[in-house]
Amino acid sequence: MDEFVRRHGATLRIAGMHGTPAQARRSGYKGGMKSIDTLTPCPCGNPAGYSRCCGLLHDGLAAATAAQLMRSRYSAYVLKREDYLLASWHADTRPASLRLAAQQPAPTWLGLEIRQQRQIDEDHAVVEFVARYRLGGGRAQRQHETSRFAREDGRWYYVDGELKS
């Protein structure tokens, strides 16, 4: 990997804000050690790149809005960051596991569109979105959902969602 970085000038994030993998383990970080080329646009669609967008949230920064959390959760699905998805899911509705690695066929995520975001009050919000994906070699499909979010202790959490037809 070091040779790839020297040749291509790419910066890779491995342990995120925790520093080296050893420092991450000492700090109690239990997430997967994922890597992504920071020159690549963020999976949520932001051309600024993963390290300046959803990567910051995946590394522990709190989302400023429910829509920002929604985008980071979409990116986590793309990157199979089950650790982040579960950590950003409200404790009252969080499943024990998502089993993303066992999904067959695994979805190929094609894009995210935030249709509407509405602040209910200071600590509750609703985000309507469409996520496009493909299963195996099949045709593209859409997941159109209205999701509810709650903020506790300054952090937004996904509560639940309602699929739309």
Spans of model-derived segments:
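Short Cys/His-rich micro-motifs in 6-15 aa windows
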Residues: 56-65
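Cysteine-centered loop/knuckle micro-motif
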Residues: 52-54
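Short, aromatic-enriched amphipathic alpha-helices that serve as compact interaction elements
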Residues: 64-80
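Short Cys/His-rich zinc-binding micro-motifs
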Residues: 38-48
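Short solvent-exposed beta->alpha transition segments
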Residues: 87-114
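Surface-exposed, charged secondary-structure patches
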Residues: 104-142
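Short beta-strand edge/turn micro-motifs at domain boundaries
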Residues: 4, 10-15, 141-165
